[in-house]
Amino acid sequence: MATPLFFTDNAVAKVRELIEEEENPDLKLRVFVTGGGCSGFQYGFSFDESQEEDDTVIERDGVKLLVDSMSYQYLVGATIDYQEGLQGSQFVVQNPNASSTCGCGSSFSI
């Protein structure tokens, strides 16, 4: 079986904080890949209450991360992190499958 995604402590803590702010314990973080961006593919993040039949679920410390089957093939082995810096705060994907990424890090190519 392929190596699943890794969900860092920072990402888990931020997702938990956002779910608590929304006061909806059914929310899960969905990570997906779409076509676009300057390198061909880009990452997307959203909160979702529903889990689809073909979703891969990564659960850590009570927080769930969902990935649809199409996106999963591009994200196998990736690390989902949350970083705060001078240029703002954001979820970041460290993807070993990406052959190149754009300068902003939000799009990639295989």
Swiss-Prot record:
Binding site for iron-sulfur cluster: C38, C102, C104
Record keywords: Iron, Iron-sulfur, Metal-binding
Coiled coil: none
InterPro entries per the UniProt record, alphabetical: FeS_biogenesis, FeS_cluster_insertion, FeS_cluster_insertion_CS, FeS_cluster_insertion_RrpA, HesB-like_dom_sf
Cofactor: iron-sulfur cluster
GO biological process: iron-sulfur cluster assembly
GO molecular function: 2 iron, 2 sulfur cluster binding; 4 iron, 4 sulfur cluster binding; iron ion binding
Cofactor binding note: Binds 1 iron-sulfur cluster per subunit.
Pfam family, one: Fe-S_biosyn
Similarity remark: Belongs to the HesB/IscA family.
Function: Required for insertion of 4Fe-4S clusters for at least IspG.
Assembly and oligomerization: Homodimer.
NCBIfam families per record: iron-sulfur cluster assembly accessory protein (TIGR00049), PRK13623.1 (NF010147)
Protein name from the UniProt record: Iron-sulfur cluster insertion protein ErpA
Organism: Marinobacter nauticus (strain ATCC 700491 / DSM 11845 / VT8) (Marinobacter aquaeolei)
